[in-house]
Curated annotation (Swiss-Prot):
This is Protein nucleotidyltransferase YdiU. The active site is at D252. Mg(2+) binds at N253, D262. It catalyses: L-seryl-[protein] + ATP = 3-O-(5'-adenylyl)-L-seryl-[protein] + diphosphate; L-threonyl-[protein] + ATP = 3-O-(5'-adenylyl)-L-threonyl-[protein] + diphosphate; L-tyrosyl-[protein] + ATP = O-(5'-adenylyl)-L-tyrosyl-[protein] + diphosphate; L-histidyl-[protein] + UTP = N(tele)-(5'-uridylyl)-L-histidyl-[protein] + diphosphate. It comes from Pseudomonas syringae pv. syringae (strain B728a).
Length: 487
């Protein structure tokens, strides 16, 4: 493991030149304090755990100090926002500090969010507030722990610097780690501004650096796009299976790597509600929970348009056509596993859809239902869960079908089935009210709850002594919270 001054930088994106990003130095925030750090994320950089305790750590990730090898850049991109094209966006408050090359041979972007104004700030102050920084940190880390592809969060640093949103708040910075910060909107920018050479350069960069195995295929760019489709199908399947609602699926928030990216007004479902909208600015429900699947496919079509100089339209359409069947296969497999089933049967899709309909009509807690279903032998668990449903007759019919379906498995004991279920059904998720409680304490200078919640969420499938309060249904005030994009 390394000290902070021993990190090895290899800034591949910066070398693409000024057409792709602008050199900008971070604007420091005052009186920086470390709120929380993720040792597992920092280990991706080969950083020794004790490095986060050093004053230098908070100084670097608050913009006061910088490695001599770092080359902070604000990246340019555009994107479709709520379906309408915005021709010029870019990093308005975040900077790609550089790329660290670790001992495993991986490159990791160090992106500092809240680092101040850039040429793309669009009248903004370039700052991120403490509450949104904490939310992004916790979301990144719990998604990773759940096995959902995501950018990582290294740390959050708070400050005394005031910023104005709806009210006065404190500025903060969050360190985001990802193997690329290229977005769908990055390619869209050069396509729509009619810069074919730059578009080709960026496409080659993505292909060479992030999809090198596709270079061996007869049509490398088509192979790359197909893999992007496949990755997004699997990603969205995991979102839907675990009840994650992103909230702002604009194409500038879609990673070229097929990972969860750019956290804003996200939420995990409390009660199951397929029409849930977590973003209070989404008046039409474009990015509602149930719309995430078609929107992901729409976004892939937007990316495909930017790739038409390299791939035929027919081939792109065929690749996009793979998305829905791939998604459905991944989703059904995940839901099958959540129900403790290991062998595919034709009635599985109906079994899942009937359950979700019953949950929707009864307002059943989505996470706790699956966890409790694996707490006991099936017959006992179903008797316990029966009281959560309004349509008792409907639930009894489903329970009978579920037990018959288990009988078809002939695969191990009841205890083995329960063990399998606990390995895929979390006890703890990031509920918005839990995040809000931690944020409220942090805004008063008490970071203990943020750190405790982070530790609980790092092992979401394992029951932790004394942490039962994090595995409860939310209070009435904490349900169905809609979150502002203001951050």
């Amino acid at each position: 493991m390394k000290a902070l001054d021993e990190l090895i930088f290899d800034n591949r994106f910066a070398r693409l030149g000024d057409a792709f990003s602008t050199s900008v130095l971070p604007e420091p925030i005052d009186a920086p304090q470390l709120v929380v750090a993720s040792q597992s994320a920092l280990a991706l950089l080969d950083l020794a755990p004790e490095q986060a305790d050093l004053p230098l750590f908070a100084e670097i990730f608050s913009g006061h100090k910088l490695w001599s090898e770092a080359e902070p850049r604000a990246m340019v991109y555009s994107g479709h926002q709520f379906g309408s094209y915005n021709p010029r966006l870019g990093d308005g408050r975040g900077l790609l500090l550089g790329e660290v090359y670790n001992d495993a041979g991986e490159h990791w972007d160090l992106h500092l969010k809240g680092a101040g104004r850039t040429p793309y700030s669009r009248m903004g102050d370039g700052r991120a507030v403490l509450r949104s920084s904490i939310r992004e940190f916790l979301a990144s880390e719990v998604l990773h722990a759940l096995g959902i592809p995501s950018s990582r969060a290294g740390c959050v640093v708070s400050s005394s610097t005031p910023v104005w949103r709806e009210t006065q708040e404190h500025a903060a910075m969050v360190l985001r780690l990802a193997q690329s910060h290229v977005r769908f909107g990055s390619l869209e920018y050069f396509f729509y501004t009619k810069q074919p050479e730059q578009l080709k350069t960026l496409a080659e960069h993505v292909l060479t650096m992030h999809y090198p195995h596709c270079q061996e295929q007869p049509e490398p760019y088509l192979a790359m796009f197909r893999e992007i489709v496949e990755r997004n199908a699997e990603l969205i399947a995991k979102w839907q299976a675990y009840g994650f609602c992103h909230g702002v699926m604009n194409t500038d928030n879609m990673s070229i790597l097929g990972i969860t990216f750019d956290f804003g007004p996200f939420a995990f479902l409390d009660d199951f509600d397929e029409h849930f909208i977590c973003n209070h600015s989404d008046h039409e429900g474009r990015y509602s929970f149930s719309n995430q699947v078609p929107i992901a496919q729409w976004n892939l079509s937007a990316l495909a348009q930017a790739l038409t100089p390299f791939i035929s339209v027919d081939a792109l359409r065929e690749a996009i056509g793979l998305f829905l069947p791939l998604y459905q296969a991944h989703y059904l497999d995940l839901m099958r596993r959540r129900l403790g089933l290991t062998v595919a049967h034709e009635q599985d899709e109906q079994l899942v859809s009937q359950l979700l309909k019953l949950m929707q009509n009864s307002g059943v807690d989505y996470t706790l239902f699956f966890r409790r279903l694996g707490d006991q032998p099936a017959a006992e668990a179903l008797r316990t869960l029966r009281d959560d449903f309004v349509d008792i007759k409907g639930f009894d019919g489903w329970a009978q079908a579920y037990q018959a379906r288990i009988a078809l498995e002939n695969n191990g004991t009841e205890q083995e089935r329960q063990t399998r279920m606990h390995a895929v059904n979390p006890l703890y998720i990031l509920r918005n009210y839990l995040a809000q409680n931690a944020i409220a304490a942090a805004e008063k200078g008490d970071y203990a709850e943020v750190r405790r919640l982070h530790q609980v969420l790092c092992t979401p499938f394992t029951e932790q002594p004394g942490m039962q309060g994090y595995a409860q249904r939310p209070p009435d005030w904490g349900k169905h919270l809609e979150i502002s994009c203001s951050s």
